[in-house]
C-alpha cells in the first residue's frame, strides 16, 4: 500500500519523473565472483571504498523512494549494514537486502544473541528447534546464550517492512556453477529455512540466461514454496558492457553464448504469464506480459535510480555514462530520450537486448503505455490471494550438485524439510 500511495501522490501532483525504488550500493566488495556480474570489474579501482552511513540514509531521503534495495557487492559485508537497515526502516521505507546468502546465518545469530539476552524464555524454543534441524551447531547455540559480543551494536530483526532477498539462479548444480563456488545453494537453503523459523520475510531473485532450463526454474519455485519463501522476482540476463568484458577476459568465454537477446528473452519467458498465476511473483502482470512478447513497454530507468560510492549512476543500473552528485542533477541533466527501445528501435545500441526488470517494471507499475484494465490487473496481482505451488519436486532434483556427488542422502533429506 505504501508504494501505491506513493504512485497516486505523484500522479495527482503531475510529477514527470520520480523514484519508485532506490538501488543502494554501499560498497562493491563481494565474497563471490559470479558469472554474469560485471560490478567487480567495473568498480575495480574502488573495491575497498564504502559509502558513509550518513550518505546512504541521505540518498533515501533525497530521492524519497518508498522502497530501498540494498545491493552491491555483498551488502552484508558493509560494516554498518545493521545501522543502515534500521535507519531506513525508521524512515518508514520497505527494505530489501539483496544477498548471496553466505552471511545470512551469521547476521541472524547476532540477532538471536541480543534476543536471548532480553527474552531467554521466548528464544530458547527457537534455539532448540534450530539445533534440532541442524541450522545451528551446539557451539553456536552456546555462543548465542552468552549474549552479544557488542551489546551496543544494532542487529537485523524481523520486520513486516523488510525482506531478505536471496540470489538464486537455479537448483544446486546450476546455481553453484554460476556463483563459481560449491555449497552456496545449500547454504542459501539453510539460511532461508532459519529465517522463516525466526519470522523473517524472505524473497528470492533469479536471472534467466541463454542456457537456463525453464523447467528448472519452475522446479526451483516449487521447492522454495516448501520453505515458505514469500515471493520471487525474475529477470532476463542482459549483456551489459561490464559483464561482457568480465566474462571474456576473466573466464575466456563468449558472452553471446550466455546472455539473452531480446528475441531469446521472449522465447525463454513464453510462460511468464502462467508463472504469475502459479507462483508468488513480485512485480506486475504487465511486466510479465512484456517479457513474454505480448505487449510493448518503454524503459523508465529514471524510476529506479542507483546510488553508489561514486554518486548517482547514470543512466541506469547496468549502463554507466557518468555519476552525478545529487538525485536532482541525475533526473534533470540526463537526456533520457537517448535510451531504451521505442517501437522496436534501440535509441542506444547498448539498450537493444535489454528487457530487465529494473528498466521496464516501473513502466508497468506507473502505467506508462497503459491499457484499459491494467490498474485493476496490477492491484489484484499484488493484493489478491497469493498463489502457492502444490507440486513439490523430489529432493534429488533439487540437490543435484555437490550434494549428489557427495552421496549423503541423510543430510540431503534434512535440508529438504520445510
Regions found by a protein language model. Name each.
Residues 51, 94, 121-126, 130-133, ...:
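Radical SAM enzyme [4Fe-4S]-AdoMet core and its adjacent flexible, acidic
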Residues 18, 313-418:
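Flexible mid-to-C-terminal extensions adjoining Fe-S/redox cofactors in radical SAM and related proteins
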Residues 29, 33, 298, 350-353:
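The −1 position to Zn-ligating cysteines in a subset of zinc-ribbon hairpins
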Residues 77-78, 104-105, 210-213, 323:
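Alpha-helix N-cap/loop-to-helix initiation residues
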Residues 38-42, 172, 247-254, 330-335:
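Short glycine/proline- and charge-enriched loop/turn segments
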Residues 40, 71, 167, 235, ...:
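Conserved residues at the C-terminal ends of beta-strands
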Amino acid at each position: 500500500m505504501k508504494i501505491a500511495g506513493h504512485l497516486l501522490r505523484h500522479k495527482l501532483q503531475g510529477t514527470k519523473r520520480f523514484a519508485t525504488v532506490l538501488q543502494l550500493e554501499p560498497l562493491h566488495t563481494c565474497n563471490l565472483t559470479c558469472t554474469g556480474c560485471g560490478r567487480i570489474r567495473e568498480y575495480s579501482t574502488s573495491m575497498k571504498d564504502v559509502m558513509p552511513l550518513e550518505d546512504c540514509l541521505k540518498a533515501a531521503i533525497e530521492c524519497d523512494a518508498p522502497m530501498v534495495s540494498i545491493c552491491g557487492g555483498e551488502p552484508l559485508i558493509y560494516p554498518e549494514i545493521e545501522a543502515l537497515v534500521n535507519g531506513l526502516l525508521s524512515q518508514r521505507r520497505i527494505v530489501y537486502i539483496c544477498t548471496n546468502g553466505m552471511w545470512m546465518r551469521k547476521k541472524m545469530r547476532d540477532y538471536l544473541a541480543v534476543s536471548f539476552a532480553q527474552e531467554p524464555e521466548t528464544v530458547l524454543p527457537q534455539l532448540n528447534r534450530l539445533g534440532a534441524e541442524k541450522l545451528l551447531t551446539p557451539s553456536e547455540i552456546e555462543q548465542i546464550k552468552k549474549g552479544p559480543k557488542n551489546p551496543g551494536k544494532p542487529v537485523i530483526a524481523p520486520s513486516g517492512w523488510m525482506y531478505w532477498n536471496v540470489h538464486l539462479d537455479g537448483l544446486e548444480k546450476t546455481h553453484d556453477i554460476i556463483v563459481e563456488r560449491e555449497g552456496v545453494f545449500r547454504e542459501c537453503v539453510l539460511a532461508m529455512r532459519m529465517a522463516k523459523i525466526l519470522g523473517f520475510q524472505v524473497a528470492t531473485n533469479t536471472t534467466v540466461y541463454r542456457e537456463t532450463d525453464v523447467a528448472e526454474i519452475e522446479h526451483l519455485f516449487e521447492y522454495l514454496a516448501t520453505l515458505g519463501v514469500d515471493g520471487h522476482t525474475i529477470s532476463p540476463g542482459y549483456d551489459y558492457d561490464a559483464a561482457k568484458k568480465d566474462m571474456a577476459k576473466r573466464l575466456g568465454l563468449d558472452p553471446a553464448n550466455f546472455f539473452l537477446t531480446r528475441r531469446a528473452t521472449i522465447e525463454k519467458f513464453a510462460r511468464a504469464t502462467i508463472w504469475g498465476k502459479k507462483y508468488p511473483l513480485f512485480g506486475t502482470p504487465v511486466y510479465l506480459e512484456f517479457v513474454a512478447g505480448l505487449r510493448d513497454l518503454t524503459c523508465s530507468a529514471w524510476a529506479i535510480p542507483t546510488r553508489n560510492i561514486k554518486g548517482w549512476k547514470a543512466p541506469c543500473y547496468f549502463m554507466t555514462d557518468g555519476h552525478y552528485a545529487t538525485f536532482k542533477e541525475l533526473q534533470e541533466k540526463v537526456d533520457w530520450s537517448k535510451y531504451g527501445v521505442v517501437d522496436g528501435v534501440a535509441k542506444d545500441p547498448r539498450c537493444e537486448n535489454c528487457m530487465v526488470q529494473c528498466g521496464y517494471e516501473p513502466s508497468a507499475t506507473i502505467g506508462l503505455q497503459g491499457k484499459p484494465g491494467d490498474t485493476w490487473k496490477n492491484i489484484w496481482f499484488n493484493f489478491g490471494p497469493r498463489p502457492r505451488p502444490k507440486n513439490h519436486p523430489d529432493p534429488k532434483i533439487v540437490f543435484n550438485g555437490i550434494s549428489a556427488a557427495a552421496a549423503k542422502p541423510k543430510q540431503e533429506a534434512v535440508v529438504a524439510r520445510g
